[in-house]
Amino acid sequence: MRERRKIYEGKAKILFSFPDNPNLVTQHFKDDVTAYNNRKHSVIPGKGVINNYISAFFMQNLQNVGIKTHFVKVLNMREQLVKKAELIPIEVVIRNIVAGGLAKRLGLEEGMILDAPLIETYYKSDSLGDPMVTDDHILSFNWLKLSEIEEMKVMAWRINDFLSGALSSAGIILVDLKLEFGFYDDQIILIDEISPDTCRFWDTETKEKMDKDRFRRDLGGVSKYYREVARRLGILNGSF
């Protein structure tokens, strides 16, 4: 049997080749947690397992409502099989409530509800700190065509709408989320992950933070609240 090889290692995940099919890769979820462009780092045992299952849950449900994603299936507690997509170097952030970088950048009070979801785009580059870019930047540097930008944003809005509703029924507010996309078979698909690492989740009643802000802000209880998100979504089991 052919051995798999490491293709790429990021801050929170590793991609391995999938010898049985060159069009697929194995996505491995690490226990590492980072913030501020990797200037803050720790390891939280079990975090990768929780994020693997949470992301699989969201990806499967998004596919059920017609959103194309890279997800194929869960392989084990830490890994899932995904389509080998060509990365689009743009991160899409959708904000429903003022928090984090938006509050700091514009001097706004955290917790202010936006009249409509606000969409932002960032150039994906750790060395540059993922700078914000406009549609004109994206077009000027030929990262995407105008029709592709529009398609990506429509997908992002649909994802936000679906996740907001799903999380609301679990007593969780979707404050904001970061999405990544790629090309597969000449189509734009959702890639990467959807988890407390890539979203801001607040408890509906208490506004308690249930995401990576617990690590960023030294609030503690990262594992506890990640598990609580999984429990409320109905995917908590003995594996956790």
UniProtKB/Swiss-Prot annotation:
GO terms for biological process: 'de novo' IMP biosynthetic process; cobalamin biosynthetic process. GO terms for cellular component: cytosol. GO terms for molecular function: ATP binding; phosphoribosylaminoimidazolesuccinocarboxamide synthase activity. It comes from the Bacteria. Its EC number is 6.3.2.6. InterPro entries: SAICAR_synt/ADE2_N (IPR028923), SAICAR_synt_PurC (IPR033934), SAICAR_synth (IPR001636), SAICAR_synthetase (IPR050089), SAICAR_synthetase_CS (IPR018236). Pfam families: SAICAR_synt. It is an enzyme of class 6 (ligase). Pathway: Purine metabolism; IMP biosynthesis via de novo pathway; 5-amino-1-(5-phospho-D-ribosyl)imidazole-4-carboxamide from 5-amino-1-(5-phospho-D-ribosyl)imidazole-4-carboxylate: step 1/2. It catalyses: 5-amino-1-(5-phospho-D-ribosyl)imidazole-4-carboxylate + L-aspartate + ATP = (2S)-2-[5-amino-1-(5-phospho-beta-D-ribosyl)imidazole-4-carboxamido]succinate + ADP + phosphate + 2 H(+). Keywords: ATP-binding, Ligase, Nucleotide-binding, Purine biosynthesis. Belongs to the SAICAR synthetase family. NCBIfam families: purC (TIGR00081). This is Phosphoribosylaminoimidazole-succinocarboxamide synthase. It comes from Neorickettsia sennetsu (strain ATCC VR-367 / Miyayama).
